Amino acid sequence: MSSFESDSASDAESAFSDASSDFTPSSSVKSKGKVPLRDSTNTTAQPSAPATGDASDQYQKLSQLEHILKRPDTYIGSVEKTGVEMWSFDAATESMIYKEVHIVPGLYKIFDEILVNAADNKIRDPSMRNIKVNIDAENNTISVMNDGKGIPIEIHKKEKIYIPELIFGNLLTSSNYDDDEKKVTGGRNGYGAKLCNIFSTEFVLETADLNTSQVYKQTWTNNMANLTKPKITKLKSKKEYTKVTFKPDLSKFHMEMLDDDILSVLRRRVYDLCGTVKDCNIYLNDKKLSIRNFKSYVEMYVNAIRERSPDPVAPEGETRNYSTIVHEVFNDRWEVAFAVSDGSFNQVSFVNSIATTSGGTHVKYVSDQIITKLIDALTKKEKGKKKLNIKPQEVRNNMFVFINCLIENPAFTSQTKEQLTTRVAQFGGKPSEKIVISDQFIAKILKTSIADKIRTIVNANEDKEMSKADGSRKSRIKNQVKLVDANKAGTKEGYKCTLILTEGDSAMPLAVAGLTVVGRDYYGCFPLRGKLLNVREASIEQVSKNAEINSIKQIMGLQHKKRYTPENIKSLRYGHIMIMTDQDQDGSHIKGLIINFLETSFPGLLEIPGFLLEFITPIVKVTITGRGNHRVIPFYNMPEFEKWRETEGTTCKWKHKYFKGLGTSLESEGREYFAALDRHMKSFHALQDGDSQYIDMAFSKKKADERKDWLQAFRPGTHLDPQIREIPISEFINKELILFSMADNVRSIPSILDGFKPGQRKVLYGCFKRNLRSEIKVAQLVGYISEHTGYHHGEGSLAQTIVGLAQNFVGANNLNLLQPIGLFGSRAAGGKDFSAVRYIHTNITDLTRVIFNPLDDDLYTYVQDDAQTVEPEAYLPIIPMLLVNGAEGIGTGWSTNIPSFNPVDIVANIRRMMNGEEPVDMTPWFKGWEGDLERISPEKYKVSGKIEQVDDDTVEITEIPIKTWTNSVKEFLLAGLGNDKPWIKDMEEQHGINIRFVVRLSKEEMDKSLRMGLLERFKLISSISLSNMVAFDPQGRIKKYSSANEILKDYYWARLELYQRRKDMMAENFQNQLTRLSEQARFIKLIIEKKLTIANKKRSEMVDDLKKLKFTRFNKNGKPVHDEPLVEAEELAEEEEEAAGDISQLNLGLVAPEDESQYKPETTYSQYDYLLGMAIWSLTRERYEKLLRQRDEKQEELNELLKKSAKDLWNSDLDDFLVGWEEFLRADIEARNSFGPTAKTSTRKRARKSTKSEPAQKKTKSSTPKASTPTIKAEATPAQPVVKEETNKQPDLLSFFSKEPSVAKTVSAAPPKRKTPKSKPKKEIVSLFSDSSDDDITSFSVGDAKPTPKPSTNNILDELEDLKSSTFTPKVGAAGRRRPKSYALAESDGNESDEDYMSE
């Protein structure tokens, strides 16, 4: 007990033995000129003078000893018996018990002071092993003895008395007054043991000092008023000790004896030492206590709690270890244990062995950490919730915290030391000695019942919060302005009423119009604003603040957590809900969300038959227009309409109208619908077994894997039976809601064929349809695409899609299909920093039409949207753009993340597959990126930037991980430069062509960074995963691919099949031209030989003659007509003029009629126009001979085509692509190396240049493609040069015949072009269906037209050279790549307007 409570003046040693001889101090111990303290008289022992009543008698001066005895509560607490609930030790059961005891706090405190002194000695002398406490209640005697160093037995140099007497018999003496010395003992103010002495009738001190080999013993009596001379004897053993024995002055505490209550508390305090003093044996009444450490000490409390509150049952599927103590020794100074309390916060804490029964800053600091981390951990488990709806105090009330800590120079609220006041920052210790609650500690706590208790509290709070928005059955609701309330709602007949929930405000007029039919007594309407919240995993905050849900609850009168049955449904304002949404996928989703809301919050409602209804309206109305068969057929879903169109729709004439939304219908139609309410109203079947599981699968975030299986099992054509009157919820989910989920995935997941999502596909289709050749404002292009491609979403999203297709900074597209003419975003912000779309321009790039070959356009299947033909279901470019540019997206149940790869590697693998070889593994590649890729697993790559140390205190960052943007790195560096503990001295940005951050560090931080690794310290490492490559396969099914080569293989076979179809189409077109030329030659020959006369004949007579001569008929698409029945001209006489106007507006190539069934068949007349439309001057023998030569040439071209395989055609396209790719890379390098004000100008020049094509006969093999489409050479023999279009036209064969529309006229049918300067050469017209009756009949070359590439300038270009020279033996030119008739276009000179040739 080393001079108790730090009261010793020096470290000395003691021993467990009595002195063998007496020792009498000499008179020299008395100081000169000063009376020793032991000889002074305590003034408290003298009687005070009686008061005389004057002012002097009213004001007294007391000595400190007198003050302590008169005002003991200031020093030791109350000296009156006080009833208080606290932990005590039950000697009978030998266990802790929490009960109300009546004790005198002052008596407890003086005992505690002696006990703490004994514990403090363990800090001074770690070799101390024993503390022995004896409590003799009968004799009112308490003794505390400890081994270890004793009190120095020597004379104090200044006070001239023995040090033991100084520190135990004189106030304000201590060794703790040096505040510069950091101590973790309990003594602090110099009172301690003296207070015990003062409040004792007898106080005996005994200590042994090994240094002097003496034993010191001294006795004080009469409240420290009297003392004996010290008895000093010789120490016989070599063990030091200190022992204090005292008899409390029970009269001062108004007690007669030590009763059971105070004894139980004193015994508990002795047990406290078992837990707080490490490696020390604790004895009580000569019995060694079995508690060995803090954890076993805590178990005594937990066992007591368990006896009062048995363990609850753990939730199913979870493990709860309620009885185990969560205990951790964090460091030498902090030891913490946790248990679950029984409803109120409990703490048992010790500071330097002092029992802080009222807690303090140390308890708050630890418990606050536990509470915060508990809430955070439970919040993470409750996905979708920002924070649990619980207050920290509510968590605290369920905690029992045990703390044993050492704090330097602790401060308390008073001398009683019940509450620590030391600030956290002054706890002291090294950083490693601070207390930080670990995640492992929290994880263990979560396995106790605290988690369940917190959830119970959260649920109660949420219920309380949700109840605030509860409705009630009242006749009028005043705060819902948009509600059209039923007159009977909220009355005793309210259960008969039906609330119609419409999809948005636009549908309200239709519903309100219907109320004029059914009346307003039992029907009300309310518009839903957008889609209802998915409440399944939503936080209570989200649900309680959701306006739509609160409105429904108020309007319906729903009360939170009330279980509704057919018996109590009369308590609602409405007895039914009827959903009235659009008949599209989004409408189905809204229905599903309402079902999900009811099943989650009010499941009883769905169990009531007829509660939930839906109102259906037609999505398509078909009007049969045939004579005597005029009728209207409504269709309520698209699969049903598509099936009808392919069957019955082919047998009659009809027209149709799409109803994309309820707002499309007229109010009169609304009244018509409600008049036939039974036909348009369907009910949902009451909840059946398994329905809840389907709802959970469709809407729970936890069921993502199940949704994947559900969507993979989908088959096109799936739809809900329109005849069913009562819809099972499972049927609705599996046959209607699934259509929305599939549509969501289609919007979010790309196709393997073209790598596009629908929005991107629409953009490209719109550019092709517009025949985009010169730059156009993005804002203008947005409007055009929105109008012509059936885009039904916001134009802002469409603009972002266009910008995304044009972005070419590092980390964006490897191959941008649109030109970024302007500021389209940068690597700094990941492209989000693009300029307003009204300022930036775009155009298709040179390579776009090389990759998306026009010859394929007629081979695609095009989507029908609202009676309009729009983009193809999927393009099939000559290389897989999904691998070239990669893709990311999040759909329903599925997401995708596909990195980009090098087009050179892709082409090489395609050619390997052409040669029957297996493709080799490809590594992700990003144009312009110079970082490092390292494969760390089959499905993962490590992505590293570049950083190097340039001198002792400087590093340079010259590359960052791909998809990490410059601004993010800058933010990280600035945070290191300016936070509370900056580790960066300075940072500069010196970006030029490439990234360059220059960062300066201190020597210490540089050393630390080098130890950690520069890449790691500066967070220049990320990863690329190949484990989530999802796309729609060629059959339109969602598929997860395991590798890039698996994607390539699926693409390869689809593309190869399309090449075969292209070849077949080209061969068929060549054959048709041969037939056409032959028939024209035969026609001219008959005219010349006068075997056929056309002059002075009626039109019908001429057609009859041609029929008899069996001339082949050709339809408007240039194909021969063989089997179609002829329509007699007489029957079509009236219809022909009307049809001519409509048919002339049809697109003759890509775009089909809006609805083919609305148009009349072709007439026989038009099918002979290729003969009767020939100019008169063509009827000559020269023309006849020329046609025969052209026929032979065409036959030769056909023979050349038939010699080639599909692979030959593909390889030829790949050759052209590689040449264009080389030029593309050169231009990209030049653009990135360009600086100054001329950069933008040069970009625009290139854009204009790309729209100008040289005449075909002037091109050489060394030239590279400049046009946005592959050039198709129109070659002619020397003897027969290509004839230009004549400006002076000859008279027509018959005055009422019009010359057959040439391809040039097809192009010019659109709005007139701006005039071209005369100096510009005329552009040749190239057509696969060249059918002009004059000399302008074009032949096609099948020779090798592969241009020679320019010399390579870098490694990428060298790879291109190697690839072109070493793979795939056959070398086939660009011969078969000809435009179909629909793409027969005059070359642009750059000044022409963009013509919409697809709409002509």
From Swiss-Prot:
Which residue ranges are recorded for the region named Interaction with DNA? 379-386, 1019-1028
- Give binding positions for ATP: 117, 146, 174-176, 187-194, 415-417
- Feature type site, description Important for DNA bending: 890
Domain Topo IIA-type catalytic, by residue range, is: 749-1214
| EC number(s) from the headed UniProt entry | 5.6.2.2
Q: Does the keyword Acetylation apply?
A: no
The GO annotation for biological process reads:
chromatin remodeling at centromere; DNA strand elongation involved in DNA replication; DNA topological change; regulation of mitotic recombination; replication fork progression beyond termination site; resolution of meiotic recombination intermediates; rRNA transcription; sister chromatid segregation
Basic residues bias spans: 1312-1321
Region Disordered: list its residue ranges: 1-57, 1235-1400
UniProt-listed SUPFAM superfamilies:
ATPase domain of HSP90 chaperone/DNA topoisomerase II/histidine kinase, Ribosomal protein S5 domain 2-like, Type II DNA topoisomerase
The UniProt record lists the keyword Nucleotide-binding = yes
The site feature described as Interaction with DNA is recorded at: 531, 534, 707-708, 757, 791, 797, 965
Query: What molecular function does GO assign, one term?
Result: DNA topoisomerase type II (double strand cut, ATP-hydrolyzing) activity
Q: Which positions in this protein are listed as binding Mg(2+) 2? A: 582, 584
Q: Which cofactor does it need?
A: Mg(2+); Mn(2+); Ca(2+)
Report which reactions are catalysed by this protein: ATP-dependent breakage, passage and rejoining of double-stranded DNA
* SMART domains per the UniProt record, alphabetical: HATPase_c, TOP2c, TOP4c
Instruction: Tell where it localizes.
Output: Nucleus
The annotated regions of Polar residues compositional bias extend over 39-57
State the source organism's domain of life. Answer: Eukaryota
Q: What does this protein do?
A: Control of topological states of DNA by transient breakage and subsequent rejoining of DNA strands. Topoisomerase II makes double-strand breaks.
The annotated subunit structure for this chain is:
Homodimer.
Q: What is this protein called?
A: DNA topoisomerase 2
Name its species: Meyerozyma guilliermondii (strain ATCC 6260 / CBS 566 / DSM 6381 / JCM 1539 / NBRC 10279 / NRRL Y-324) (Yeast)
